[in-house]
């Protein structure tokens, strides 16, 4: 791999002076930062405004017709001056140098257009040498983040909310890693509670050892459904201690008291379920560092939490239950029960205990909970309680929320498990692929490709809009190769691969030393400008925690590549021109590959 100073060493090769480096900028790995530094430095000389105020005021444009960066003059807060007049004066005086093609005033804005020739000489070699590392940047030093995501309940369906948490959390974990954080991926399972008493009693009645080993998640769910049916049918006709409910309570009590025999069965259920989850998550390119769960929160931590609540004067009793009145700190937060009248703790207390345990163990710099927006109140109460307990690290907790998925069900009915969704997507994708007989005949492992493309369909549909928005799960739209879908991204990647294969006589070593000044067409210039944006897209995504930032960028990129095919031919050109164009396509494929991997997809080579 080339050194990360590649961009700056390239500047030296071109005998171009490097602009002064602004705070929090990374010009060695981000061309847009290099441009920001140049613009800030030069605009400061013209305007007399400090460059440290100009740098953060530079914004992305919403269309490339408005340039690559713009500055709204009102953001500089210059008293007594007309922003439109200043924009005109400063734009006229601005030196384009090697960096810019033109500078234009547009109302109270100045628009800066990067020089595509200059960009090509820096960006294309940078992408081709850094490969998978292009886009990554060490934004922080020695910082640790825990990301808790997915968190299904054992023996209950893995519903749409878990799917969204898994996809968004997987993306965030990859993003934080790319930008220099040490990431701990954590799955906090619903693996404790009275339902395990029910499961144990149910397993004695309806369990099957072979079925448990073969498919623990479905089998335990079937047992759970049947035992709940028994409870329903019994009603109040049997004395509590003889009833199914009574036996389940008694069993869970044994678990809570540490009875080895009771815990042995529970451990088997938990371990088998985790093994099955590991396989399913692997299909989404997710590997957890820690499988935690409600069961892992020690009794000591919860008792310590309740003692601390009392010590800080946060609690009061009501009919034997212990409550915390949070309205004193924020009227919207209401009152939270932390201990029931029978002395048992609630989910909230368990979460507080878990957070305390985690800080003790990992000393994280940040902890992110990827949980549905229905839990907004719960998360806000939980964070406020930790803050009022006096924990300095409470400010480092963040809730990344998301909306609902509507209409997710399979052919066989409405109870949905993640592996059912993935299997059905694979089958449907396979059916779609078979319709094109010629292409289908060329695919070496069609089922494997159908699986990867199908998974892309599910994931892109989920990440396409802002995460807070609800969306409808639509098979037809999702599996289409037309429009902005996962299969379209896969198709775009495989087509770029085929361009490379068809010109295999021109080696990748030649690409880096190509004459990029031959890339003169407007379509090529636009593509080069887009490729330079990728590192900045990642930095923007970490501010908003929005996967759609990356998804939208990848669709822009693939649409532009598609426009290039009509005008930038490789076949039948002189070797010099073919090499330059091939280098551009190779760089575009690398950036598309990097973006797809970041989102959790596996790009396919042929389809």
Curated annotation (Swiss-Prot):
ATP-binding keyword on record: yes
EC number: 6.1.1.19
Coiled-coil region(s): none
GO terms under biological process: arginyl-tRNA aminoacylation; mitochondrial translation
Motif ('HIGH' region): 151-162
GO cellular component, one term: cytosol
Binding site for L-arginine: 148-153, 162, 347, 351, 375
Subcellular location: Cytoplasm; Cytoplasm, Cytosol
Catalytic activity: tRNA(Arg) + L-arginine + ATP = L-arginyl-tRNA(Arg) + AMP + diphosphate
Modified residues (Phosphoserine): 15
Superkingdom, natural source: Eukaryota
InterPro entries named in the record: aa-tRNA-synth_I_CS, Arg-tRNA-ligase, Arg-tRNA-synth_N, Arg-tRNA-synth_N_sf, ArgRS_core, DALR_anticod-bd, Rossmann-like_a/b/a_fold, tRNAsynth_Ia_anticodon-bd
Spans annotated as Interaction with tRNA: 59-60, 106-111, 484-498
List of residues that carry N-acetylalanine: 2
GO MF assignments: arginine-tRNA ligase activity; ATP binding; sequence-specific mRNA binding
Keywords: Acetylation, Aminoacyl-tRNA synthetase, ATP-binding, Cytoplasm, Ligase, Nucleotide-binding, Phosphoprotein, Protein biosynthesis
Stored PANTHER family: ARGININE--TRNA LIGASE, MITOCHONDRIAL-RELATED, ARGINYL-TRNA SYNTHETASE
UniProt similarity note: Belongs to the class-I aminoacyl-tRNA synthetase family.
Entry-linked HAMAP family: Arg_tRNA_synth
Role played: Forms part of a macromolecular complex that catalyzes the attachment of specific amino acids to cognate tRNAs during protein synthesis.
Quaternary data: Monomer.
Additional free-text comment from the UniProt record: Present with 20600 molecules/cell in log phase SD medium.
Name of protein: Arginine--tRNA ligase, cytoplasmic
Species assigned in the record: Saccharomyces cerevisiae (strain ATCC 204508 / S288c)
């Amino acid at each position: 791999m080339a050194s990360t100073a590649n961009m700056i060493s390239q500047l030296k090769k071109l005998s171009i002076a490097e602009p002064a480096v602004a705070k929090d900028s990374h010009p060695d790995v981000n061309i847009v930062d290099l441009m920001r530094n140049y613009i800030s430095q030069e605009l400061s000389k013209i305007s007399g405004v400090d460059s440290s105020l100009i740098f953060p005021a530079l914004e992305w444009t919403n269309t490339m017709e408005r340039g690559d960066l713009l500055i709204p003059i009102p953001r500089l807060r210059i008293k007594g001056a007309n922003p439109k007049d200043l924009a005109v004066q400063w734009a006229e005086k601005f030196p384009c140098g090697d960096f810019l093609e033109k500078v234009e005033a547009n109302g109270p804005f100045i628009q800066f257009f990067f020089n595509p020739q200059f960009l090509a000489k820096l960006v294309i070699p940078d992408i081709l040498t850094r490969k998978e590392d292009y886009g990554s940047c060490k934004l922080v030093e020695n910082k640790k983040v825990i990301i808790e995501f997915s968190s299904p309940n054992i023996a209950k369906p893995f519903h749409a909310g878990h799917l969204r948490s898994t996809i968004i959390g997987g993306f965030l974990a990859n993003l934080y890693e790319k930008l220099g954080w040490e990431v701990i991926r954590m799955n906090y399972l619903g693996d404790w509670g009275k339902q395990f008493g029910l499961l144990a009693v149910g397993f004695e009645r309806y369990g099957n050892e072979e079925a448990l080993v073969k498919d623990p998640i479905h089998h335990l769910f079937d047992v759970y459904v049947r035992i709940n049916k028994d409870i329903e049918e019994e009603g109040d006709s049997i004395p509590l201690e003889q009833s199914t409910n009574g036996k389940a309570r008694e069993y869970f009590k044994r678990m809570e008291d540490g009875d080895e025999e009771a815990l042995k069965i529970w451990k088997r259920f938990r371990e088998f379920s985790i093994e099955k989850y590991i396989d399913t998550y692997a299909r989404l390119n997710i590997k957890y560092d820690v499988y935690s769960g409600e069961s892992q929160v020690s009794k000591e931590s919860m008792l310590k939490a309740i003692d601390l609540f009392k010590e800080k004067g946060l609690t009061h009793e009501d009919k034997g239950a212990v409550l915390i009145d949070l309205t004193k700190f924020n009227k919207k937060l209401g009152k939270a029960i932390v201990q029931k009248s029978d002395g048992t703790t609630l989910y909230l207390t368990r979460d507080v205990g878990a957070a305390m345990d985690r800080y003790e163990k990992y000393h994280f710099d940040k902890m992110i909970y990827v949980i549905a927006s229905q839990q907004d109140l719960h998360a806000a109460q939980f964070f406020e309680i930790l803050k009022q307990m006096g924990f300095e690290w409470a400010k480092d907790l963040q809730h990344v929320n998301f909306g609902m998925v509507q209409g997710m069900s399979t052919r066989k009915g409405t109870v949905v498990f993640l592996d059912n969704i993935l299997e059905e997507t694979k089958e449907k994708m396979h059916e779609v692929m078979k319709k094109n007989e010629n292409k289908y005949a060329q695919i070496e492992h069609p089922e494997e490709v159908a699986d990867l493309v199908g998974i892309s369909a599910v994931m892109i549909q989920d990440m396409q809009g802002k995460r807070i928005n609800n969306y409808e799960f639509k098979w037809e739209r999702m599996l289409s190769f037309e429009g902005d879908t996962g299969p379209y991204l896969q198709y775009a990647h495989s087509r770029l691969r085929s361009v490379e294969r068809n010109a295999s006589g021109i080696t990748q070593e030649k690409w880096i030393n190509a004459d990029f000044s031959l890339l003169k067409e407007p379509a090529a210039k636009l593509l080069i400008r887009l490729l330079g944006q990728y590192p900045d897209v990642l930095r923007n995504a970490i501010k908003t925690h929005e996967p759609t930032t990356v998804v939208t960028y990848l669709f822009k990129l693939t649409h532009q590549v598609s426009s290039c095919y009509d005008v930038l031919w490789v076949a039948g050109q002189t070797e010099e021109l073919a090499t330059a164009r091939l280098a551009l396509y190779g760089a575009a494929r690398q950036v598309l590959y990097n973006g797809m991997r970041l989102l959790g997809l596996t790009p396919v080579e042929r389809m």
